[in-house]
Amino acid sequence: VPATDALPFRGMPCLVWAYGFDADGSGHPLEVATLDDEHLSKARQEHAWLWLHFDTSDARTPQAIARLGLSEEITEALLSHDTHVSLQMEGVTAFGVFVDWRHQRGVDIGKHSFARSEKEVGWLHFAVGADLLVTARRQALRSVEQVHQHVRGGVHFDSVAEVLEAIVEQFAASVAHATDELGTELDRIEDRVLTDRLGEERRDLAVLRRQG
């Protein structure tokens, strides 16, 4: 979409959220309904850096992302349906795809069991530059939601890269948690199997004694 063309909608309603971060690392929500080119430019001037999180299932997202001034390759990567982890560099901008658990709305993130019900994965497309983090996904993603909660809760992030690192760390922690849960469940299954076997051996022994 050429930058001179007017968008057929106001603001950026295809954004899930948008934050402006100050030099001290504190994040402040931006009003996506009024975030047009003028307000976006003003936000970039007023804040050290921005985090824009898009919903790629929204048909308006390609037009909105096209107005961010990113290269064609980075724009295509953000909007692609690629389901392979990747990381590329173009100048000072890193972009690619990360894997994450899909998140069900209304589920308590802190108490949810990954190993039992988080069987499907989703894909986070991202581009991170010096003063702009753009992330995009089709479904809500668990680690991204967790980091978003941290931002809303007042956790400070000193750089664009720190937010992306936090998302990756959340996913890694969830994988470790799932592995631990799986190991515990396997131990329980093994204990039940051994108990059943022991019960069978005792029954066999009782039969042999009666036969004797």
Task: Give the ranges of each region predicted by the language model.
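Peripheral, non-transmembrane regulatory/ligand-interaction domains of membrane transport proteins
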Residues: 1-212
